[in-house]
Swiss-Prot record:
Quaternary structure and interacting proteins, as annotated: Interacts with MinD and FtsZ.
Keyword Transcription regulation listed: no
Record-stated family: Belongs to the MinC family.
GO biological process entries: cell morphogenesis; division septum assembly; regulation of cell septum assembly
Job description of the protein: Cell division inhibitor that blocks the formation of polar Z ring septums. Rapidly oscillates between the poles of the cell to destabilize FtsZ filaments that have formed before they mature into polar Z rings. Prevents FtsZ polymerization.
Keywords assigned: Cell cycle, Cell division, Septation
Record-given protein name: Probable septum site-determining protein MinC
Amino acid sequence: MPIDFRMTKKGLILLIESYSSIESLKQEIMAKFNEARDFFSEGDEISLMLTQETSKPDDIVNIVSLLGNLGVRVKDILVGSLEKKNVKIGQKYDLVREKVTEVRGAQVIKRNLRSGQIVVHNYDIIVFGNVHPGAEIIAGGSIVIFGTARGILRAGYSVGDEAVIAALDLKPSLIQISGLISQDYNVYETPAVAHIRTGRIVVEKIESAKFEVKGGKI
């Protein structure tokens, strides 16, 4: 089945093998949870398992947000496959969560993010700490890191080109804003910001950044 629940020694897994569109997937997930509504309680934890084909960062934001609205907490994101009746896990990312603030629904993380940890949120993400290599952040809005930024940073899945990625020390292995990706960018020893200008990602010192807005630059 394209979408199914699997009970393992480590708990319940929602397995997503395939889907035609994110909207159809959301409908299927809601139908699955409706069928099993007597099984779940508010705040229950599950693992979300995707295949290499379905582990799309922009869709992960929507899936995690939907599951939260359905009352369950995603404790980790797995990437693997279903072989016969056995679940084979290739990669595992622990989902880091903190209380959402009142500021536009931003999620504030007050810790360092280590390798194998992932933060997924539909709005802005603010990190008071370092993002180490092997960690990943996926944001619907912007990402601001009060620390050193390594790992993979993906922003703008909800707000698009208006998103920015800023850090006191911005040196990630990959930057993605909306549909644009960059691994080759200017590196500074002072606070820097990545943003989209004239259709490409640019990284500049925060103090001298020239942001593109409708009608020109500021």
